[in-house]
């Protein structure tokens, strides 16, 4: 028989920097999960990633106080800002442009995000990324 699920916890944690302080500690502590065990497992799995890159994670908590977690790809907005070399998007995205990315950069981001996107092929994924970039005030050349 499968274990009884008591809840899901969604967090965004910087790669390799999970520690028991908020938001990780309180979120896991409420469900009675072993915080240090999660931190060690998460940091081990994000070892190969760029340090500090926010990684969305979905933790499944079970009734016997055990857990499993699934890591997602970093948010598209973070990858777009990194590619465009800007700190934040525009406050008026359709009038003030803060940067630009090329189609090649958009394709690279789309390849990274492909497991989490609903796009059928790479071209559709690139258009999705281009739309996200435009809504941040970043132009996409060649799309």
UniProtKB/Swiss-Prot annotation:
One GO CC term, this protein: cytosolic large ribosomal subunit
GO BP term (any one): translation
Keywords from the UniProt entry: Methylation, Ribonucleoprotein, Ribosomal protein, RNA-binding, rRNA-binding
A GO term for molecular function: large ribosomal subunit rRNA binding
InterPro entries: Ribosomal_uL11 (IPR000911), Ribosomal_uL11_bac-typ (IPR006519), Ribosomal_uL11_C (IPR020783), Ribosomal_uL11_C_sf (IPR036769), Ribosomal_uL11_CS (IPR020785), Ribosomal_uL11_N (IPR020784), Ribosomal_uL11_N_sf (IPR036796)
Superkingdom, taxonomy of origin: Bacteria
CDD domains: Ribosomal_L11 (cd00349)
Pfam families named in the record: Ribosomal_L11, Ribosomal_L11_N
Signal peptide stretch: none
Cross-referenced HAMAP family: Ribosomal_uL11 (MF_00736)
PANTHER family: 60S RIBOSOMAL PROTEIN L12, LARGE RIBOSOMAL SUBUNIT PROTEIN UL11M
Protein name: Large ribosomal subunit protein uL11
Species for this entry: Burkholderia multivorans (strain ATCC 17616 / 249)
């Amino acid at each position: 028989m499968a274990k009884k699920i008591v809840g899901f916890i969604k967090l965004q944690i910087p790669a390799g920097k999970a520690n028991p302080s908020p938001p990780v500690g309180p979120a896991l502590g409420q469900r009675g999960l072993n915080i240090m065990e999660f931190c060690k497992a998460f940091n081990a799995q994000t070892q190969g990633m760029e340090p500090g890159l926010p990684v969305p994670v979905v933790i499944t908590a079970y009734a016997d106080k055990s857990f499993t977690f699934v890591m997602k790809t970093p948010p598209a907005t973070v990858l777009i800002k990194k590619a465009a070399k800007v700190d934040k998007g525009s406050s008026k995205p359709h009038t003030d442009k803060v940067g630009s990315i090329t189609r090649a950069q958009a394709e690279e981001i789309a390849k990274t995000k492909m497991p989490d996107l609903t796009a059928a092929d790479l071209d559709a994924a690139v258009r999705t990324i281009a739309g996200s970039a435009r809504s941040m005030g970043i132009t996409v050349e060649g799309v």
